[in-house]
Design a protein with these regions (language model features):
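Short beta-strand to alpha-helix junction loop
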Residues: 84-88, 120-141, 262-267
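Active-site substrate-recognition segment that forms the wall
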Residues: 211, 216-217, 222-261
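N-terminal Rossmann-like FAD-binding beta1-loop-alpha1 element of flavoenzymes
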Residues: 27-52
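Glycine-rich FAD pyrophosphate-binding loop
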Residues: 44-69
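N-terminal FAD cofactor-binding segment of flavoenzymes
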Residues: 69-110
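Central helical "cap/lid" subdomain
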Residues: 60, 73-75, 174-221
Length: 338
């Protein structure tokens, strides 16, 4: 029986409607941080069938939060990954406007304190944005809008990615894969030796993030520290969240983190003491803690050449690695896929 041209078109439309595998390309995205969720958004909008894998118990990548446990701040979330974000490119400004409309994010400050050998001064810069309850909440919002459109596996550790004409992620076949996790982690799961070699060229610096709550008022918003071998940045969490809670986060220098990363208790003590010295306070802490980020800041890197069915996204390939760079790189994922 001859179907006829019109009937064939109807059948193709039905196949597309039901997203049969050989009509709709199936793409795996590994990593549900900023760039991974941005890439998943772009791929879904372009009509691809997306499966998103993330190994963490919670999504977010380097958008880490901790919940305080000691009164009077019990239940209060603090950022222990990225502290804030800025927006310079129009595409990202549109996304930020959406977060602002949803009351997920708000403007914080455009001026930080700077301390160096000459004392304390103020430095103006771009507007810093923060998120109510922590930056990770931005990605919770994004994944809530994506969940019904993708297959999503949280707390799932991918063990192997085989890349040939097709891609296999833990033996499951896809047409392409997006590596949206730090290159050292990607290199541990990719089986192809040439791709492993390319990924091994991308390096990251570590950072330790400590924090404390106290009864002492903190008379600053954010502070760049240029005269300490241990501390790089201080953030007043009470200022960020507009609740004036006396909570400070302390971001280490790369060099300090590399030297102290294997003894977190000692590192925390050193960072707390240094912060007290910088702020000229003598605080007894209600609560304190420390977080280790082995893969915190990417060193300057060229994006490695990948097969046409592999994309690698993230802020590692930006001159200014940050949340904006990660989001935009993920949103441009189709430029890497054939």
């Amino acid at each position: 029986m001859e179907l006829g041209f019109t009937n064939c078109l109807l059948i193709l439309d039905l196949l597309r409607h039901f997203e049969i595998g050989y009509i709709t390309k199936r793409i795996a995205v590994i990593g549900a941080g900023v760039s991974g969720i941005s890439a998943a958004n772009t791929l879904v909008d372009a009509g691809y069938s997306v499966t998103l894998f993330d190994q963490g118990k919670s999504l977010g990548g380097r958008l880490g939060i901790r919940t305080l446990k000691v009164p009077p701040y019990q239940g209060r979330n603090i950022d222990v990954g990225a502290a804030y974000f800025t927006a310079s490119e129009e595409d990202f400004k549109l996304k930020v406007e959406e977060w602002l409309r949803q009351k997920l994010a708000h403007q914080w400050v455009d001026t930080f304190s700077v301390i160096d050998e000459d004392g304390i001064s103020n430095k103006s810069g771009p507007m810093r944005y923060v998120a109510s309850g922590g930056l990770k909440n931005l990605l919770f919002f994004e994944i809530a809008n994506l969940k019904d459109k993708i297959d999503y596996f949280q707390d799932y550790k991918v063990t192997e990615v085989e890349i040939n004409n097709k891609v296999r992620v833990d033996k499951k076949q896809f047409d392409a894969v997006v590596l949206a996790l730090p290159a050292p982690q990607a290199g541990r799961i990719v089986l192809n030796s040439e791709i492993k070699s390319e990924l091994s060229k991308i390096k990251f610096n570590p950072v330790l993030v400590s924090w404390f709550s106290s009864n002492i008022d903190l008379a600053f918003d954010g502070m760049f520290v240029n005269n300490s071998s241990a501390v790089n940045l201080l953030i007043n969490e009470g200022s960020k969240q507009r609740d004036n809670n006396n909570i400070c986060t302390i971001y280490s220098t790369h060099e300090f983190a590399a030297a102290e990363i294997n003894d977190l208790d000692l590192a925390k003590e050193k960072l707390l003491n240094e912060a007290n010295k910088i702020l000229n306070i003598n605080s007894s802490y209600l609560e304190s803690g420390i977080m280790r980020w082995t893969l915190a800041h990417p060193m300057p890197s060229e994006r490695p050449k990948m097969p046409s069915n592999v994309a690698i996204v993230g802020d590692a390939f930006s001159d200014n690695p940050r949340i904006e760079a990660a989001w935009l790189d993920g949103s441009r994922v189709l430029e890497q896929l054939a």
